[in-house]
Design a protein with these regions (language model features):
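Surface-exposed, charge/polar-rich loops and edge strands
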Residues: 1-323
Length: 323
């Protein structure tokens, strides 16, 4: 079973479908997590034989290797098959691949039952590995009619405990305050262009089931920083509807806190919301409950470079092995 944790949009899927049709190939793998808390697959993976190495401009070193021993391949296949897979990145690619497979199968009656078009290339890694890196993606709101930072803070106080942070504080100071707040519940930092900043932590004395916007979130989502930000602040205070959030009408999604704060203080945008990274366990809990998180809730790092491995999608060529 494959579990998504984000909704997909029709525009990006249409773009990817055109790429599939033009290239008849999967040029960029998905990114999925399997469960292996006892690291039982490590010994099989260790049999891999090196094929190539390269470094990308972002400073990441990549190694490509091949597992060819039959017993190792079987151990990996069986181990992954026992696990529910969580999509970390590549929701649009995955759904597009499914649609493309149906399209080709319908148009090509002679297509092999194990044709290449029926398989999706994906990078799999152990979701229980403590070395797995997830970075936060922040929210930078802009073009807000009549917005004032003071009014945001005043309205937020009905839902959040408000703690003023040092004016003009560096990004490291703000993100450190966020890290310390994690133990108290969902929290974000709101920063203004003039240097003001506040730590907002969800109050424990309010009935979330009766909250105007948070009540529409399933309880499992109300435990996450990102869902509380989107429902409690972006929609509840700033009036950015879920549809506008999906369309990115008033939002940018920066990944580096220092760079985003610098742009804000240089006059770009109205307010910056800094986030903690969403723990993998929270993402899996939401997905297993059948829900999805807001867009760009996670940023798994590093990504596999496009073109490092290519899976052709020829319906007449069968992929070796069992279906």
């Amino acid at each position: 079973m494959v579990l998504p944790h984000e909704r997909t949009l029709s525009g990006p899927k249409a773009d990817r479908l055109e790429l599939f049709r033009a290239t008849r190939a999967n040029l960029s793998p998905g990114f999925m997590l399997y469960r292996d808390p006892e690291r039982q697959l490590d010994s099989a993976l260790a049999t891999a034989e090196a094929l190539a190495e390269l470094s990308t401009p972002d400073g990441v070193h990549h190694a490509l290797a091949k597992v060819s021993r039959p017993e190792a391949v079987r151990a990996i296949v069986d181990g992954v098959a026992r696990s529910t897979l969580l999509i970390a990145d590549g929701h649009h690619r995955y759904e597009t691949a499914l649609g493309y497979a149906h399209e080709i199968t319908a148009a090509t009656p002679s297509a092999s039952r194990l044709g290449e078009h029926r398989f999706f290339m994906t990078f799999l890694t152990n979701g229980d590995d403590p070395a797995l890196v997830v970075f936060p993606t922040h929210r930078h709101a802009h073009s807000l009619s009549g917005f004032t930072f003071g009014e945001l803070v005043s309205q937020a106080a009905a839902t959040f405990v408000v703690e003023e942070l040092p004016s003009g504080a560096a990004a490291e100071v703000l993100t450190e305050a966020l890290r310390h707040a994690k133990a108290r519940g969902p929290a974000v930092v709101a920063a203004a262009p003039d240097g003001r900043a506040v730590l907002l932590t969800l109050r424990g004395d309010i009935d979330l089931g009766a909250h105007p916007t948070l009540s529409r979130q399933p309880p499992v989502l109300r435990k996450t920083d990102v869902a509380v930000l989107h429902a409690g602040l972006l929609e509840g205070v700033l009036g950015i509807t879920p549809a506008a959030q999906a369309a990115k009408t008033n939002l940018w999604y920066p990944q580096g806190a220092a760079a985003a704060l610098g742009e804000l203080r240089a006059g770009k945008g109205d307010v910056l919301f800094l986030m903690n990274a969403t723990p993998v366990a929270d993402v899996r809990e939401v997905a297993e409950a059948g829900h999805v998180m807001p867009q760009k809730s996670t940023f798994f790092y590093p990504k596999v470079p496009t073109g490092l491995a290519i899976h052709t999608l020829d319906p007449s060529r069968a992929v070796p092995g069992e279906p």
